[in-house]
Amino acid sequence: MDKLTEVLNLAKSKGYFWPSYEIYGGVSGFYTIGPMGSLVLKNIEDLWKSYFVRPNGFLEIDSPDIMPARVLKASGHVDNFKDPMAECAKCGSKYRADHLLSDSGIQVSESTSINQMNELLNQNKVKCPNCGATTWTVKQFLNMFETNIGPYADNKGYLRPETAQGIFVEFKTLLDINRGKVPMGIAQIGRGYRNEISPRQSMIRLREFHMMELELFMDPEDEKAPALDRDMKLPLLHEKVMEKGEPELISPYGAYKNGILKSAWLAYFLEKSFKFVMALGVPESKQRFIEKLVGERAHYSAQTFDHEVFFDEMGWTEVAGFAYRTDYDLKSHAKETGQELVVIEKKTISTRKTIKLNEKEVKNTHKKDWESIISSVPESREDGIYCAGIKLSSNEYKIIEEVEKEEVRKFVPYVVEPSFGLDRLLLATIYYAYGKKDGRNILSLPDVILGKVVAVLPLVSKKDMIEKAFEIKAMLEKSGYFVIFDEKGYIGKRYARLDEAGIPKAITVDGQTLEDGTVTIRDRDTWNQKRIRPSDLLV
């Protein structure tokens, strides 16, 4: 049994995730996230926000899952969000044409045309996995779930294929909320839907999935991106080294300055993503960024890099994509709606300064000369302000600066988008946490993912021990811990169950606990134990 199969079996048995609708035979492309999976998913989301949202003061929204057809027609998805579908002439089974070819050892790219795939399938007599026939018809298949909004058949809608369009259509309101300033980052975490022809590879290709996306709106003439790291090295398999097949190790700063990356924000997000995925437990050597070439990238993108993680069984697998969407989306929605989706920037060209006297102070200070001072024109000299030849103190006047001339500039901001597949990240996190010790399964999840999870175990099922264990459980929960309570079975078997589930710490309540209040705390990875007071965990 390979590692991925073991991980998938463990994920189901320990409540992380499993195929949905199994009592009905299952439906490919749908997975249920279990109790432990939901907990880890939320912690991955929070970690992502700590890398991508909070440090820059970005905003977060939650838009509807259903979109009017008009929105997705304007965005280009209705015309372009399609995959090549091959239909068997004998049995009618349908598959992704490019997947059929690659499974037969015939490599194609995303730029390979429908006609070319049709020829390759038929000329190479690729067999139908269902009936063995070798005659195919290939056509485009729209990857969006269609629905009606309300009772009218002509009011068509789609389940969103990405959360991004829910951000773009709200740009005008969000810009006002952000007081007209760019750069402006808008994040959204939610579900996406893609009516995949033939979903496979467990959590990798789903029909309903979780996404974490961020749209960064910026001035293309002045990006104002954060400082880029000059020391860390990113493995970039970019266009210039694609033929060699080996990534170039280069800093985010160097990649931008050398023109490999078209945007400083794009470089910044790749840097953040590399560190974020490392924090999930994926080693540097098992990560890379690969550039999508012309004909491969999405219709809205001027440059795209995929962040890939290596699985022994599946090879390099995308977990995130970074698209330089420029002004494509905002211009498309502006054209369709007639709305002006722009940033208005006012720049002062010149100002005029005027000196206004505080007549009350002048009268109080200059009882003899105040009339001549007030009737004269203030004069600015190197050492101060004078009126009628008399130098005034600072409380006798104020200088008012007024805009004399300003320049108004309107521009459609450019967009850089980091987009993460949350389900894929969950799988990668568990995959790289999975290991064995003395023949036992251990899920060594990082502390940033399960650090605030602990098990409380009464050594034996005695009333006083159980009561004390519940008391400790309540104290820990009050302090923000997620607590698992388990009193069934031998203590060694309970430890093994917890190790396999990834629970980092286990507290055992025993006879000594009833005497002095101390408990045994056991570490999942080292199996070391020591006695502490439960309150020590709150420090």
Predicted features along the sequence, with ranges:
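NTP/phosphate- and nucleic-acid-binding module
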Residues: 1-539
